[in-house]
Amino acid sequence: RVSISKAFYLAKTEVTQEQWVAIMGSNPSEYKGRQNPVENVSWNDVQEFIRRLNAKEGSNVYRLPTEAEWEYACRAGSTGTYSFGDDKGDLGTYAWFDENSGERTHPVATKRANAWGLYDMHGNVMEWVQDWYGETYYSSSPSTDPRGPASGSDRVVRGGSWDFDAGFVLAAPRIRVAPGVRYDGLGFRLARSLS
């Protein structure tokens, strides 16, 4: 169990293709739609998006969430398998996954939000987080505001995607992906520091 002591904002939705194009000028996504989540972006691509967004805004507040922040926000106070409890039968109300996606992404915020008003925390696209992946990191990590290992070869993605089955579109599973990988089920959402 970990705790988050520093307040932060997390975007209600995954970054859309329209938002990506406004900053980057082109759309790398396989499944086109202005309000669909941008996908087919690497962790490195996302860092460049964040750099440009912060420069445009004249700030340094936008970033990826840490893995701990992401799970805290996904769960929204729940201790269940999913943000809404343990009933897999309810997943289609909250998530685009392999049983209902038609093998593609969908516009953000078309499924029910979690208790804190965050959409698509399960499914649609997996989401990059800031942390390096460490298989045993959480067995000895700080219990308050863990930030992942100091280095590594892979980054963490969370949340599952449109092509995952219900057993992988959960609140807790962690997946490791090299930071240069692009995939049509992989996107992100922004966090914003408050200080």
Locate the predicted segments by residue.
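Short aromatic-cysteine micro-motif
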Residues: R1-S78, E99-Y119, L194-S195
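Structured loops at beta-to-helix junctions and adjacent beta-edge loops in soluble globular domains
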Residues: T13, V41, G85, F97, ...
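Surface-exposed recognition segments
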Residues: R1-S3, S78-T79, S101-R104, M121-S195
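Chymotrypsin/trypsin-fold serine protease catalytic domain
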Residues: T79-T105
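Residue-level signal for well-ordered alpha-helical positions
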Residues: I23-S26, A76, G85, F97, ...
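Short, hydrophobic secondary-structure boundary micro-motifs
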Residues: E30-G33, Y82-F84, S140-S141
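Short, solvent-exposed turn/loop segments enriched in Gly/Ser/Thr/Pro and often Arg
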Residues: E39, A68-E71, D87-K88, R158-S161
